[in-house]
Amino acid sequence: MVKSTSKDAQDLFRSLRSAYSATPTNLKIIDLYVVFAVFTALIQVVYMALVGSFPFNSFLSGVLSCIGTAVLAVCLRIQVNKENKEFKDLAPERAFADFVLCNLVLHLVIINFLG
């Protein structure tokens, strides 16, 4: 029973890797950016757990900035993906401009929250 489960998991990872290798480079770069943003948020949470969160507004601002940026990057990835039929008429330049504008608004709110 355990061997078949292990074999199924290996087959699953192999199929995911082969499917992801066909992903365009621009989507892989966006994926890397999302992973970096989430990893940065996790580092901030671990730091807060170990050291403390004295300036709590700063901690919240940093984590919300990372998570908000990751969410906006996922939205960009959805819009730029050529296989997505919902955003077929949307130009990649327009999607990137929306991403930049939303990031600007997000970070203005974050800076305002810092006080």
Swiss-Prot record:
Lumenal face of the membrane: 53-55
Pathway(s): Protein modification; protein glycosylation
Taxonomic superkingdom: Eukaryota
- Where in or outside the cell is it found? Endoplasmic reticulum membrane
TM segment ranges: 32-52, 56-76, 95-115
Cytoplasmic-side stretches of the chain, per the record, are 1-31, 77-94
Keyword annotations for this protein, in alphabetical order, are: Apoptosis, Endoplasmic reticulum, Membrane, Transmembrane, Transmembrane helix
What is the tissue localization of expression for this protein?
Answer: Ubiquitous.
> How is it placed in the membrane, per its record?
Multi-pass membrane protein
Family per record: Belongs to the DAD/OST2 family.
Per the entry, what this protein does is: Subunit of the oligosaccharyl transferase (OST) complex that catalyzes the initial transfer of a defined glycan (Glc(3)Man(9)GlcNAc(2) in eukaryotes) from the lipid carrier dolichol-pyrophosphate to an asparagine residue within an Asn-X-Ser/Thr consensus motif in nascent polypeptide chains, the first step in protein N-glycosylation. N-glycosylation occurs cotranslationally and the complex associates with the Sec61 complex at the channel-forming translocon complex that mediates protein translocation across the endoplasmic reticulum (ER). All subunits are required for a maximal enzyme activity.
Q: How does this protein assemble?
A: Component of the oligosaccharyltransferase (OST) complex.
Record-given protein name: Dolichyl-diphosphooligosaccharide--protein glycosyltransferase subunit DAD1
* Protein source organism: Arabidopsis thaliana (Mouse-ear cress)
